[in-house]
């Protein structure tokens, strides 16, 4: 019987990943598939926290002519939509789930309180962190790194639309090569588009490894938990 390689993980989901092939909004089949995989790893005894992006509805940096702070807050609200959708899908599968928002909206989510989040995890509840850090100018990648450090996660699982980290965008450059392993310094020096530099630096300072993988295989989250050699592993 295979044993999970991690006890507590932080799963970072991009908004685009939740949109599936539609590219915008939510694909119910994709959300259900992710929820099913999360249920499977919770049943293994793994504690799961999730950070969701909002790029399937809004990206702060695309708000041309708009105040950056306002655009970023709109992006934070988009992450709340995704968090609630994922919570609903998980609870339909009988997975106890809590959404914690960095911007208070008590009718629909708990406020983010680190100690409460850790207690939820210890009770095998999934915790979804919404609204980024609650501050403009910080991406959801940085949120993932920050929350992973705060809850002392063993690893960040970075689920993307591509199956790892490449030397260039594989959808544009057909000669792009995939990396199996990288150090944080490699990522920063080569300017690879894994996470933004703030997030990478935060992971490096706190020795939090990152596993980058694609969602094209509906079993990939489980495979990563079991230690399968897929995607790209980033470490100190």
Swiss-Prot record:
Cellular component annotations (GO), alphabetically ordered: cytoplasm
Keyword set includes Transmembrane helix: no
Residues that bind UMP: 54, 72, 133-140
GO BP annotation list: 'de novo' CTP biosynthetic process; UDP biosynthetic process
Regulation of protein activity: Allosterically activated by GTP. Inhibited by UTP.
Record-stated family: Belongs to the UMP kinase family.
Listed name of the protein: Uridylate kinase
Organism taxonomic ancestry: Bacteria, Bacillati, Bacillota, Clostridia, Peptostreptococcales
């Amino acid at each position: 019987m295979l044993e999970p390689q991690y006890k507590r993980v932080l799963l970072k989901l991009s908004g685009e990943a939740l949109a599936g092939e539609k590219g915008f909004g939510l694909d119910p089949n994709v959300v259900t598939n992710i929820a099913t995989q999360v249920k499977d790893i919770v049943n293994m005894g793994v504690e799961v926290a999730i950070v969701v992006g909002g790029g399937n509805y809004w990206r702060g940096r695309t708000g041309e002519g708009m105040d950056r702070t306002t655009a970023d807050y709109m992006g934070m609200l988009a992450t709340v939509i995704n968090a609630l959708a994922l919570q609903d899908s998980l609870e339909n599968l009988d997975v106890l789930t809590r959404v914690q928002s960095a911007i208070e909206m008590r009718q629909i989510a708990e406020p983010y309180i680190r100690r409460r989040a850790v207690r939820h995890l210890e009770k095998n509840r999934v915790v979804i962190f919404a609204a980024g850090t609650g501050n403009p100018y910080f991406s959801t990648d940085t949120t993932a790194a920050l929350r992973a450090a705060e809850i002392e996660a063993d690893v960040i699982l970075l689920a993307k639309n591509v199956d790892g980290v490449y030397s260039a965008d594989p959808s544009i450059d057909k000669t792009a090569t995939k990396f199996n392993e990288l150090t944080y310094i490699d990522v920063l020096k080569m300017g690879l588009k894994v996470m933004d530099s703030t997030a990478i630096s935060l992971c490096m300072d706190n020795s939090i490894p990152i596993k980058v993988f694609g969602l094209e295989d509906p079993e990939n989250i489980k495979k990563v938990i079991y230690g399968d050699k897929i995607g790209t592993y980033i470490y100190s």
